[in-house]
Swiss-Prot record:
Acetyl-CoA binds at A376, N382, Y383, S401, A419. Homotrimer. Catalyzes the last two sequential reactions in the de novo biosynthetic pathway for UDP-N-acetylglucosamine (UDP-GlcNAc). The C-terminal domain catalyzes the transfer of acetyl group from acetyl coenzyme A to glucosamine-1-phosphate (GlcN-1-P) to produce N-acetylglucosamine-1-phosphate (GlcNAc-1-P), which is converted into UDP-GlcNAc by the transfer of uridine 5-monophosphate (from uridine 5-triphosphate), a reaction catalyzed by the N-terminal domain. In the N-terminal section; belongs to the N-acetylglucosamine-1-phosphate uridyltransferase family. It catalyses: alpha-D-glucosamine 1-phosphate + acetyl-CoA = N-acetyl-alpha-D-glucosamine 1-phosphate + CoA + H(+); N-acetyl-alpha-D-glucosamine 1-phosphate + UTP + H(+) = UDP-N-acetyl-alpha-D-glucosamine + diphosphate. Residues 1-225 are annotated as: Pyrophosphorylase. This is Bifunctional protein GlmU.
């Protein structure tokens, strides 16, 4: 089977310099959703017709299995499909999709493809309570499709028809070239419409069949930011419903955003306003607090992530405790039972089993062993203005508050670092490290008094 995806439109009503098909739905371009669905049908040829912003669109979705045809002038959907003809296998049927209709299920498309086997012409239709504005499917007394009539051309009787054309079709490819060549642009827009092909197919004696989606929203397209927002909510609702079916506890399914793939184990609980991006895995008994953002991360069983935590590219072991207001950046690896508390940032660092950094700390480019206590206000000074260096803190170290570790530096096993210490040289195992300081208390001191104006 050939699949052609039309993605050449300007999208004027989006009021944006970004090509319409590149506007994000759940964090990914609209067109990417359509391509992914198309791939599940395993086409032999997958062709995207580009036009407005062609180079930008091609760069966004380029892949070895995707070919591109260019529609230099936007002269209608029929003209767009014609540009793809040289790239198609004429011996196989062609399925035509739209780059701004992202939620059509693969099962729906397969149903249409199956209906159109043996050289039939297939149309995906949907029955609406209010079909205003859509082309109607006209059938004869025997129920066979005879034509598609647009709203402006429909008779009062035809306007009562609730079955409408979605634009998604399956057509014999060998005949498609002839039919497209016979299209006329005698309409207000001066364009060649793919919908006109159905009458040519009927005139040529081809049987026209239809299939319908399970849900109306599968055929909704995007022509404005309002419609994009509507589809975003539909998509997120579908994701939330699937998570609930799988046993995930959602404090409010309407306040969850998944912009990628979220895999959850048993008894996972997610509070409100959480965003998951990229590939995220939550193991059994993970609890996520409110207003967290988690991107490309794996979270071990029994972990608790408190509110307002931001995690990006991190790996968390089992029974870790994170947040609130913590930030784990790419390369952060936490072993089982590690704690990272409020206003702690970890970047490209390993924190060992049971180690804790509970308050106001920066840990960057570091290797921290097991059972280490990092006091509040500790900083690994990893950057000299030109290069990054690593800090190594071995097992069972106690780091007092307000400590600076100037990398590259190593702190041996069992070391105790006094509060307010700057470490710039390696410290051997078991020692106490401190900077000698003198405390002075003076009598007779009088605080300044604010002058009265």
């Amino acid at each position: 089977m050939n699949i052609v995806i039309l993605a050449a439109g300007t999208g004027k009503r989006m009021r944006s310099a970004l090509p319409k098909v590149l506007h994000p739905l759940a964090g990914r371009p609209l067109l990417s959703h359509v391509i992914d669905t198309a791939r599940t049908l395993q086409p032999s040829r997958l062709v995207v017709v580009v036009g407005h912003g062609a180079e930008q669109v091609q760069a966004a979705v380029a892949a070895p299995d995707v070919q591109f045809a260019v529609q230099a002038e936007q002269l209608g959907t029929g003209h767009a499909v014609r540009q793809a003809l040289p790239l198609l296998d004429p011996a196989q049927p062609t399925l035509v999709l739209y780059g701004d209709v992202p939620l059509t299920r693969a099962s729906t498309l397969q149903r249409l493809v199956d209906a159109a086997r043996e050289g039939r012409y297939g149309i995906l239709t949907v029955t609406l309570d209010d079909p205003t504005g859509y082309g109607r499917i006209v059938r004869d007394a025997a129920g066979f499709v005879t034509r598609i009539v647009e709203q402006k051309d429909a008779s009062p009787e035809q306007l009562k028809i609730a079955e409408i054309n979605t634009g998604i079709i399956v057509t014999p490819t060998a005949q498609l070239s002839m039919w497209l060549g016979a299209l006329k642009n005698e309409n207000a827009q001066g364009e060649y419409y793919l919908t006109d092909v159905v009458e040519l197919a009927i005139e040529a004696g081809f049987e026209v069949v239809t299939a319908q989606p399970d849900e109306e929203w599968e055929t909704l397209g995007v022509n404005s930011k309002a419609q994009l927002a509507e589809l975003e909510r539909i998509h997120q609702r579908n994701i939330a419903e699937a998570l609930l079916v799988d046993g995930v506890t959602l404090a409010d399914p309407a306040r969850l955003d998944v912009r990628g793939t979220l895999r959850c184990g048993r008894d996972v609980s997610i509070d409100v306003n959480c965003v998951f991006e990229g590939n995220v895995t939550l193991a059994d008994n993970v609890t996520i607090g409110a207003n967290c953002v988690i991107r490309n991360a794996s979270v071990g069983a029994g972990t608790r992530i408190d509110a307002f935590t931001h995690i990006d590219g991190a790996e968390l072991g089992a029974h870790t405790v994170i947040g609130p207001y913590a930030r784990l950046r790419p390369g952060a690896q936490l072993a089982d039972e590690a704690h990272v508390g409020n206003f702690v940032e970890v970047k490209n660092a390993v924190i060992g089993h049971g180690s804790k950094a509970n308050h106001l700390t920066y840990i960057g480019d570091a290797d921290i062993g097991a059972r280490v206590n990092i006091g509040a206000g500790t900083i690994t000074c990893n950057y000299d203005g030109a290069n990054k260096f690593r800090t190594v803190i071995e097992d069972d170290v106690f780091v007092g508050s307000d400590t600076q570790l100037v990398a590259p530096v190593r702190v041996g096993r069992g070391v105790t670092i006094a509060a307010g210490t700057t470490i710039w040289k390696d410290v051997a195992d078991g020692l106490l490290a401190l900077n000698e300081k003198t405390q002075t208390a003076k009598s007779g001191y009088v605080r300044p008094v604010k002058k009265k104006s």
